Amino acid sequence: VFSPDATQDKKGTRDIYVAVSLKDRENLFVSHDYGDTWQPVEGQPTQYRPTSLSISNNKELVLTYGDTPGPSTMKDGGVWKYDIAKNKWTDISPIRIKKDEKAGFGYISSSIDPNNPKHMIVSTHHLDGKHGYTSDEMFRTTDGGKHWKPIFKTGFRYDHSKAPYTQVAPLHWMFDIEINPGNPEHAIFTTGFGGWETFNLSGVERKEPVVWSIMSSGIEETVPLELYAPEKGARIISGVGDYGGFTHFRPDELTDGSHSNPHFANTNGVTGAWLKQE
């Protein structure tokens, strides 16, 4: 990331920060000469590896950490803020863990409202029932990380209308989350089954359901592996990656769900008996 008030000229921005996916050694570096030379940032946590790096307009870095790069299981992690001017690190993790304990999960992404540096969101990876959560979570703060509110645990609603088949997919892999720079109520997160957006992010403050809508309209987040067109019945039977496959009676209409009984994560081949189509 580039320091928001750093010197800029024909060479570019002078002050640059880079996080590297390293563990048990220095993993955050700064350059004050346009990237010609680099030095490790003092006092940084090294017990995990960085998973995201954000910078606010008041010169504070926010880093999420995990003990693996993902998407494999994470057993430890945290969220830290670095005040560049004061050279001060602060643990602002939404779920605080005792010093001698591991979190049992990690943090994977962060976003800072460019118009309000105290407004941030972060997402977890592999959060489970150990801390009272049933799935991964997105946390929101409006005071710079002193207090956090869970968005999904507090109350939310999904709108699957653009892609009904996503109703069977659990919340997971929120590896990128973003607050719209032009609208702080508009936030986006990506998962293994598409992108989602909300236009009432602050609903969590009023205990109103935050509504998340699937963004896949004409673009499906999957890989077609096989197509079969029987003479009778369905027009097309598809085999796809991750979702198994679908039975399409009308190719121009969305299906409600994927194959079941049996269901395969990946369906690599589909065929039928041509002399006995039923």
PLM features per residue range, with description:
Residues 1-278:
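Extracellular glycan-interacting surfaces
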